[in-house]
């Protein structure tokens, strides 16, 4: 497999794997705008030259849009290989490229979000364990921080206190999200519309800065849905899934 690094220079012409429509699609435009602002902060987006979901996205942990203390580490935003790309070792290729790059940049190791059992839009814990990762912290909602250290003397990454006990003091449905995931540009407005039509208390909070992301009340900032103050899910949903959740 041949891979290419997406940069500010080729961003407009390259597809971004998780959303492969044209640049006018709101999902693509929102993701590319978010990426463009992150490249100067050290973000790397490495993908297959072929169209499809086969890529890794990572950034120095100090600049990551998650509430973690992991100074000197590299944080993996997303490692996604699916469809016909699965089963060929491409996930290992991408992770190995990240490891090599991170070592060359003097990073202490890698960290990434997962859970004890595979959850949608999170890394596969079996794959992480196979690759030498271990759990270094866990929030009350079961979201875990995994790490792979290059230095046995390095401090382990950990969640910030604000994220260890996911809870908010607000009734109704409250959704925290960022533009890191392109699907949000399409589906968050759908949920807002559905909630309004069905007289459901719903508020979407768009996290638009690294500082706000790093102080969020949830270990996951891409998409975190709360109901009456309690964390519910990180799984993006359409109108049907949302109404199924509401109706129990």
What are these regions, as identified by a protein language model?
Residues 1-51, 161-163, 182-183, 190-194:
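Short amphipathic alpha-helix that is part of the acyltransferase structural core
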Residues 47, 51-62, 75, 80:
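Conserved beta-strand in the GNAT
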Residues 64-76, 86:
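A conserved beta-turn-beta hairpin within the catalytic core of GNAT-like acetyltransferases
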Residues 81, 87-102:
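Conserved acetyl-CoA-binding loop-helix of GNAT-fold acetyltransferases
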Residues 102-120:
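Conserved GNAT acetyl-CoA-binding A-motif
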Residues 113, 132-146, 232-235:
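Conserved catalytic-core motifs of GNAT/GCN5-like acyltransferases
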Residues 140-165:
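C-terminal "cap" of GNAT-fold acetyltransferases
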Residues 228-248:
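Non-catalytic, surface beta->alpha helical segment in thiol-disulfide oxidoreductase systems
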């Amino acid at each position: 497999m041949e891979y290419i690094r997406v940069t500010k220079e080729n961003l407009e012409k390259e597809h971004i794997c998780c959303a492969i429509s044209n640049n006018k699609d709101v999902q693509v435009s929102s993701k590319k705008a978010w990426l463009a602002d992150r490249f100067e902060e050290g973000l790397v987006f490495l993908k297959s030259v072929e169209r499809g979901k086969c890529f890794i996205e990572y950034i120095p942990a100090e600049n990551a849009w998650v509430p973690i203390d992991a100074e000197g580490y590299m944080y993996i935003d997303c490692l996604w290989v699916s469809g016909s790309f699965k089963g060929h070792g491409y996930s290992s290729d991408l992770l190995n490229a990240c490891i090599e790059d991170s070592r060359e940049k003097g990073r202490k190791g890698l960290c990434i979000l997962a859970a004890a059992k595979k959850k949608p839009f999170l890394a596969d814990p079996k794959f992480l364990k196979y690759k030498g990762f271990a759990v270094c912290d866990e929030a009350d909602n079961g979201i875990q921080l995994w790490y792979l250290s290059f230095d046995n003397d390095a401090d382990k990454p950990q969640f910030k206190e604000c994220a260890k006990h996911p809870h908010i003091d607000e009734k109704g449905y409250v959704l925290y999200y960022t533009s890191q995931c392109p699907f949000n540009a399409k589906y968050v407005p759908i949920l807002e519309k559905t909630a309004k039509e069905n007289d459901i208390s719903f508020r979407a909070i768009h996290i638009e800065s690294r500082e706000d992301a790093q102080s969020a009340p949830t270990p996951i900032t891409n998409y975190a849905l709360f109901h009456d103050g309690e964390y519910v899910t990180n799984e993006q949903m359409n109108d049907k899934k949302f109404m199924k959740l509401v109706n129990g």
